[in-house]
Each structure stands twice: as C-alpha cells, then as structure tokens.
UniProtKB/Swiss-Prot annotation:
Keywords: Apoptosis, ATP-binding, Coiled coil, Cytoplasm, Kinase, Magnesium, Metal-binding, Nucleotide-binding, Nucleus, Phosphoprotein, Serine/threonine-protein kinase, Transferase. This is Serine/threonine-protein kinase 3. InterPro entries: Kinase-like_dom_sf, Mst1_2_SARAH_domain, Mst2_SARAH, p53_tetramer_sf, Prot_kinase_dom, Protein_kinase_ATP_BS, SARAH_dom, STE20/SPS1-PAK. Residues 297-339 are annotated as: Disordered. The lineage of its organism: Eukaryota, Metazoa, Chordata, Craniata, Vertebrata. Its EC number is 2.7.11.1. Residues 326-339 have a biased composition (Polar residues). It comes from Danio rerio (Zebrafish).
C-alpha cells in the first residue's frame, strides 16, 4: 500500500532542503532491498507527504559509478524512467533520493507470486519499457543492464527503468563503446566480444528479458556463466523452450530483438510499432497482479516478524538457562528476496527449489573500468579504437575475481586445489548430460547420485581451469610474436 496522498507532488528537492540533515527532511520507513552499490530504503518526504526511495551508498564504494548514476538520472525527465530528486552526504554514506515504485521490480513480482507473466501482461510491461528505452536512446544513453530486476512498477502498473549504475553515455564523436558491462545472461553478443556496441545492445537484453518474464529465467541460466559468455556469441539466438505455447506475434517480437548482427537489430522506435506492442492492453490489467504480489509481500513480512519475535523469545529463554554464556547471533537481513525457482512444464507456475547457481550469478557484472574512456571523452576520440596491443578479454578478470572471492569464503573447504583432486572423485567414464538429457540418472543408485553431486563443483573448477590453460596456451605465442615485432621496430 502507498503512504498517504501527497500534499503537493515533489518534483525536486529545494535548496533549503538540501542544506538540512536528511533525517530532518525524510522519515525512513523500511528497507526495500539491495541495488547496485547500496541499500534501498522506503521513506516519506515530510513537507510534501510523498513516498520516495532512498539509496544509501557507502562512500568507500565506487564513487565514479555512483556519480555516473546520479548524472544520468539528473538528465532524464520521462514518465518511463525513475526520477531523481536530489542527494545528501550523511556520515560515511551518500543518500540518493529517487522516485518510489511501490510494486517493486518485475522479477520481485514473479518470485513473490511464484508465477510467470501472461502474454498480455508481458506486452503491457514491454510497451512502457520500450518507451523508456526510446527516450534514453534519443538522449544518446545506453542502459546496459536491462533485465526484469531493473524494470520497476508503481502501484498503478506503470513500468519504469531503474538502476543506472552501469549506464553509459554516447557522444557524437564516439559511436560505439568498448566496455563489457552488464549482467552475463542478458548480454548482447557484441558486448561480450568487445567489438564496440551502441544503443541496440539494450534491445538484445530486452529480448532476453521477454523470455525471462515468460519462463521465469533467462536462457543459459542453468549453466555456469563463464560457459554462457562463450556460448552467447557462438550459438544461434535463443528462443522459447516451448515456442508452441506462445503467439506468433510474441515469438516474432522476441526474434526481432535477438538478432545477432546489431546492424540488423530493430530499434526501440521500430519495436513500438510491432503488432505485439501495438496490441498491448492498458496498464490497468497489471493491477490484480500487483495487488497479489504486494499482499504476498506483506504476508511474508508478517511471517518474518513473527519468526524474529519467536527467535527473540527463544534466545531470552536460552540465555537464562545458560547463565548468560550464550552469544545471540544477528538476524537475517530483510532485504530483497533471493529465492530462485524453475518453471514447471505447465503454464505460469513456478516451483521453488533450493539455492542454485542462478542465485549467485545473476548479479550485475561490471568488468571494465571506463577511466580511459572518460579521459578520452575530454579530448578527441577515435570512432574505432585501433590499439595494437591485444588485451586479455576483460570478462576473464571477472571470473578470476569470482574464484578469489570463493576462496576467501572458504569455498575450497577441502584445503586443496579442486583442479588437483583425484580423478577417481569423478571418473572419466561418467556420462555427461547433453542438452538437458538427465534420464540416465534415474537408473543410478542413491550413493552414486550423492557421489556425483559432491564431485560436481570440483569437476566444474577443473573444466574451467583446463579452459583457462588452453586459452593461455593460444594467447602467449601471439603476445611473444607481437613483442618480437615491437623490439625489431624499436631497433629500426
């Protein structure tokens, strides 16, 4: 439910408001979840009574990215893009005050209801999203992280683009960008290949988001993201798992988004004229879906509150029994829901299951620094960078960092390199499932299944390490040859 009706609509924070402490201007009500670079809270603007969202970002976070997000939001004025009202510094945090979208993200709604969206609902969401993209692209901006998690709905059903933490600006002197930034499963092929890209990279991501809204997850979500990054540029464009369940118009819309050649990919303006979007129903059809999701959210919050109260009571009892020798652990963060799920073969029903790879790998991937780009922006910039030095693809650094983080968290609890684990843990004669064919598993006994499950992570690490070694073996001779040529040129 929204808060009280605003006394007058907040357009921008006044100079007077910006000189005060944020607590004097806002009442913070509750934590909504985690966004790029910070936590997001629901708050009320005391003077107008309007509900807003406040992103609190630790100053030690990547300040350049935060400033970029603020800069892009400041320049935007569209009903299809989340509005920016102002910002504050408070202790070690930067407070960014933004428009509040009461229904949350489309991915939140899917998770809360345990259902995917219908075609009519998807068309309505896509129409607003395309209008937001048309506006951004007209302003020469690329969002670069379009996905269901970054499409927010207000309580009336209007969709708005959010989370500009990785958005980029195109200038007249720079037709294409060359940084790999975004979320792996939603990335356009040209972004992964680092061959330069423009606004239509967002259109590919929108096509993937269309499948995500229809099926509950993007294509390749069940495989390791590193493999996905190699498969997206080489495989044909992904399609629905069961195309016969969807109309010709919807299938054709997704097909036009997922054209591998960016020169042949449709623009946001062109897609707004597509029959699937032209025939979209008004936002009022989303109200039942939003009401159901918000009711589910309120119910879950009540259940969490009850559990916390019960835990507190139990803790107090245990403390008394143990004569104050027990240390009470902190409660879980009540942030954005992280449950993941897979879709059943039936219509729109999601079956929740335990933690999967999808849960830990759908976060935004910000890989290359734009430092060099920003410096070049100040002077003249070449249309197509032609540096003679061939650099290691930047997405490899991302996986190095992921592996490093896993090691720090005690991921290698066996205290040995998973790549060096004896092959007896996973014999070479084990059958590897192809294209999701897992029928042979039914014939295995429980112990063999358990053994396979235990060996899966080390097996994955070994395969990745072998892939890395093959890559290095191919790359090093090229670098050596280049160095030799450079030395000859210098001697010349």
């Amino acid at each position: 439910m929204e808060h009280s009706v605003p006394k007058n609509k907040l357009k921008k924070l006044s100079e007077d408001s910006l000189t005060k402490q944020p607590e004097e201007v806002f009442d913070v009500l509750e934590k909504l979840g985690e966004g790029s670079y910070g936590s997001v809270f629901k708050a009320i603007h005391k003077e107008s009574g309007q509900v807003v969202a406040i992103k609190q970002v630790p100053v030690e976070s990547d300040l350049q990215e935060i400033i970029k997000e603020i800069s892009i939001m400041q320049q935007c004025d569209s009903p299809y893009v989340v509005k920016y009202y102002g910002s504050y510094f408070k202790n070690t945090d930067l407070w960014i005050v933004m428009e509040y979208c009461g229904a949350g993200s489309v991915s939140d709604i899917i998770r809360l209801r345990n259902k995917t969206l219908t075609e009519d609902e998807i068309a309505t969401v896509l129409k607003s999203t395309l209008k937001g993209l048309e506006y951004l692209h007209f302003m020469r901006k690329i969002h670069r992280d379009i996905k269901a998690g970054n499409i927010l709905l207000n309580t009336e059903g209007h969709a708005k683009l959010a989370d500009f933490g990785v958005a980029g600006q195109l200038t007249d002197t720079m037709a294409k960008r060359n940084t790999v930034i975004g979320t792996p499963f939603w990335m356009a092929p040209e972004v992964i290949q680092e061959i330069g890209y423009n606004c239509v990279a967002d259109i590919w991501s929108l096509g993937i988001t269309s499948i995500e809204m229809a099926e509950g997850k993007p294509p390749y979500a069940d495989i390791h993201p590193m493999r996905a990054i190699f498969m997206i540029p080489t495989n044909p464009p992904p399609t629905f798992r069961k195309p016969e369940h969807w109309s010709d118009d919807f299938t054709d819309f997704v097909k036009k988004c997922l054209v591998k050649n960016p020169e042949q990919r449709a623009t946001a303006t062109q897609l707004l004229q597509h029959p699937f979007i032209v025939g979209a129903k008004p936002v009022s059809i989303l109200r039942d879906l939003i009401t159901e999701a918000m009711d589910m959210k309120a119910k879950r919050q009540q259940e969490q509150q009850r559990e916390l109260e019960e835990d507190d009571e139990n803790s107090e009892e245990e403390v008394e029994v143990d004569s104050h020798t027990m240390v009470k652990s902190g409660s879980e963060s009540a942030g954005t829901m992280r449950a993941t799920g897979t879709m059943s073969d039936g219509a729109q029903t999601m079956i929740e299951h335990g933690s999967t790879m999808l849960e830990s790998n759908l976060g935004t991937m910000v890989i290359n620094s734009d430092d060099e780009e920003e410096e070049e922006d100040l002077g003249s910039m070449r249309r197509n960078p032609t540096s003679q030095q061939i650099q290691r693809p930047s997405f490899m650094d991302y996986f190095d960092k992921q592996d490093s983080n896993k090691a720090q968290e005690g991921f290698n609890h066996n205290q040995q390199d998973p790549c060096l684990i004896s092959k007896t843990a996973f014999p070479d004669n084990w059958k590897v499932p192809q294209d999701g064919d897992f029928d042979f598993l039914k014939n295995l006994d429980f112990e063999e299944l358990q053994m396979r499950l235990t060996a899966l992570d080390p097996m994955m690490e070994r395969e990745i390490e072998e892939l890395r070694q093959r890559y290095t073996a191919k790359r090093q001779p090229i670098l050596d040859a280049m160095d030799a040529k450079k030395r000859r040129q210098q001697n010349f």
